[in-house]
Each structure stands twice: as structure tokens, then as C-alpha cells.
Amino acid sequence: MIALIQRVKRADVRVGERVTGEIGPGLLALVCAERGDTEAAADKLLAKVLGYRVFSDAAGKMNLPVSNLDGAGRAGGLLLVSQFTLAADTNSGLRPSFTPAAPPDEGERLFDYFVRRARERHPIVATGEFGADMQVSLVNDGPVTFWLQTRA
């Protein structure tokens, strides 16, 4: 599985005019399931997303995870948005191939599992809508962006 995480001051996702999810300071994670991914891969990726130290401590060093973004135990928001295009094969030609992405039904199942597990482990979780045409707005903080990828 893949997650492109961005440290944000705030972010929201809309389907049409309806806001489906929004957060204040925290992480926006664009999430993609690849062919052959499993729940174990999702769990491994979630642990990495929640534990990745991208927030600055008192010394200004990136040393704090989203669960403790201020060093005093305050959790930041986690906005999860499905994005199958992260699995694109761009090695040949000028048109991406999405063969590496999980089929839609499997991608939705794994994304839903990822969201469910995130809600069990983190207090502030918002989401987009799987398969919808979404508009994502964010204010990058840094910017700080990381590509995380796991295999089961």
C-alpha cells in the first residue's frame, strides 16, 4: 500500500459542494491499495503513518508524530483520501497505466479497513469518499511531504 502524507495547517475534502472531511493541523494522507495488498500491509502502513515523526519538537527537529504534534500529547487531525493514481506505472509512453492499482472493489475494501483501523487508533480521523470525484484543499505546513510504501 502507498500513502503520500503531507503535513498541513488545515485541509478539507469535498464531493460537489458537500464537505466530507476536514481537519485542522495534522496530516493529509492520500492512500492507495496496490494489487496483492492485504490487511497486513494496511496495518503496517497505518502504523507508519501514525508513527512517522514529521512535526517539530521544542528544538525545531522533526521528532513528533501526529498523535503528539505539540509535544504535550495533543493529537493532530488525520484526513484520509483514497487515490488510486498513486499506483500508476509511468515508465513508458505519455499515458499512465493503472494496472498496478488494486481493482476497485478490493481497493475500496482495503481503504475502508484502513479507515476503520485508523479510527480505532487515532482520535481525529476524517475521510473523503471512495471512488468519488473529490476536491481537496489544503494549506501545506513546510511544505513537508513523504511517500510511504509497504508490502505485507
Swiss-Prot record:
Designated gene of the protein: dtd
Q: How does it assemble?
A: Homodimer.
**PANTHER family, from UniProt?**
D-AMINOACYL-TRNA DEACYLASE 1, D-TYROSYL-TRNA TYR DEACYLASE
GO biological process, any:
D-amino acid catabolic process
What sections of the protein cross the membrane? Answer: none
- Stated EC number for the protein is 3.1.1.96
Q: What class of enzyme is it?
A: hydrolase
- Cited function: An aminoacyl-tRNA editing enzyme that deacylates mischarged D-aminoacyl-tRNAs. Also deacylates mischarged glycyl-tRNA(Ala), protecting cells against glycine mischarging by AlaRS. Acts via tRNA-based rather than protein-based catalysis; rejects L-amino acids rather than detecting D-amino acids in the active site. By recycling D-aminoacyl-tRNA to D-amino acids and free tRNA molecules, this enzyme counteracts the toxicity associated with the formation of D-aminoacyl-tRNA entities in vivo and helps enforce protein L-homochirality.
Subcellular localization(s) per the UniProt record: Cytoplasm
Q: Name one GO cellular component term.
A: cytoplasm
The organism's place on the tree of life at top rank: Bacteria
Q: Which organism is it from?
A: Burkholderia mallei (strain ATCC 23344)
Domain text from the record? A Gly-cisPro motif from one monomer fits into the active site of the other monomer to allow specific chiral rejection of L-amino acids.
Which CDD domains does the protein's record reference? Dtyr_deacylase
Provide the family line. Belongs to the DTD family.
The record places the motif (Gly-cisPro motif, important for rejection of L-amino acids) at 142-143
Q: What is this protein called?
A: D-aminoacyl-tRNA deacylase
